[in-house]
Amino acid sequence: MKALMFEAPERAVLIQRDLPEPAPGEALVRLAYNSVCGSDLSFYKGVWHGSTYPVVPGHEWSGTVVDVNGADSGLVGVDVVGDLTCSCGTCRHCAEGKPTLCGDLQELGFTRDGACAEYMTIPAANLHRLPPGTSLRAACQVEPLAVALNAVDRLAVVPGEKVAITGAGGIGLLLALAVRQRGGEVTAFAEPVAERREAAAALGVSATVGGAPGDLVALVEKHPELRPDVVLEASGYPSAVQEAIEAVRSGGRVGLIGYRVEEVGPMAPQHIVIKMLTLQASMGPGTRFGEAIGLLSSGAVDVDALLSHEFALEDHARALDVALRRADGNTRSFFNLRT
């Protein structure tokens, strides 16, 4: 089978290897689509935490179960998506429903082979069935949509609240769709790339601004009716975190969703204290897979425009380049794994 391998930082190669064999309790999945996440790009550049080389990347995927080993045989032939988090299931964090904090955590696409391949093994317990007829292309966005829903819920967004988002990449745009599902209003998007601002505007956002320091603050000072109750920070840049803190209303909430391990910067924490803000981090899909599947399969959430650039695995160099440069209106590069 074909697989994309990250051998070392900034070294991605297409390889041929034997089909993997599922271990007890695992399933073998024939993959259909996998989208390229910002964390994949950081991993490719060598600036990601808790990852190992060499490894097959990819964790936003869809596919079909073709074999199981000691798991539910009824899964064979079923279209599925799955959680990248492979945790012990018994530690304190796992018992509290926080598997991303597990001390024995393994993650598909980072510490064990992921979905940029024709086939992949995965614990059967990580799989989620797709309703018949669900688009496998759209379904590769179930995992990031679940991440967005989990973040919006951790920030406790309620109907009628105003929300601003910094960063209009894939997760930022999905956050906007998740806010809408919770009845919130996205009043502003801060994003430096013009084509991505256009993508945000197409979602019906009240206003978009560039991502330079001070842009969002200037907007809400000029238009106080846009000042958000909540700011969701999806870019991972320290300057954007500071911008969120200054732009949100007094007594408001700031959600930290994006992060970049290579970025450091100064902060002015007095704004947090003086404005009595709540900062809330969010990582992973939590328990939102089922809801994300329902929203995509029913058409309540449309991700077609988000999936902007399709590639075969053979064209992986261009897929990564376009995504890294955020060129040509790229919001999500994705691989068609059945071409």
Swiss-Prot record:
Binding-site list for Zn(2+) 2:
88, 91, 94, 102
Sites binding Zn(2+) 1 sit at: 37, 59, 143
| Keyword terms | Metal-binding, NAD, NADP, Oxidoreductase, Zinc
Q: Which InterPro entries match?
A: ADH-like_C, ADH-like_N, GroES-like_sf, NAD(P)-bd_dom_sf, Zn_alcohol_dh
| Entry GO MF terms | metal ion binding; oxidoreductase activity
Signal sequence extent: none
Q: Which SUPFAM superfamilies match?
A: GroES-like (SSF50129), NAD(P)-binding Rossmann-fold domains (SSF51735)
Please give the positions of the paired cysteines in each disulfide bond: none
Describe which pathway this protein belongs to, using the record's wording: Metabolic intermediate biosynthesis; 2-deoxystreptamine biosynthesis; 2-deoxystreptamine from D-glucose 6-phosphate: step 3/4; Antibiotic biosynthesis; lividomycin biosynthesis
Q: What enzyme category does the UniProt record give?
A: oxidoreductase
Question: What reaction is this protein's catalytic activity?
Answer: 2-deoxy-scyllo-inosamine + NADP(+) = 3-amino-2,3-dideoxy-scyllo-inosose + NADPH + H(+); 2-deoxy-scyllo-inosamine + NAD(+) = 3-amino-2,3-dideoxy-scyllo-inosose + NADH + H(+)
- Which family does the record claim for this protein? Belongs to the zinc-containing alcohol dehydrogenase family. DOIA dehydrogenase subfamily.
What is the documented function of this protein? Catalyzes the oxidation of 2-deoxy-scyllo-inosamine (DOIA) with NAD(+) or NADP(+), forming 3-amino-2,3-dideoxy-scyllo-inosose (amino-DOI).
Annotated protein name in UniProt: 2-deoxy-scyllo-inosamine dehydrogenase
Organism for this UniProt entry = Streptomyces lividus
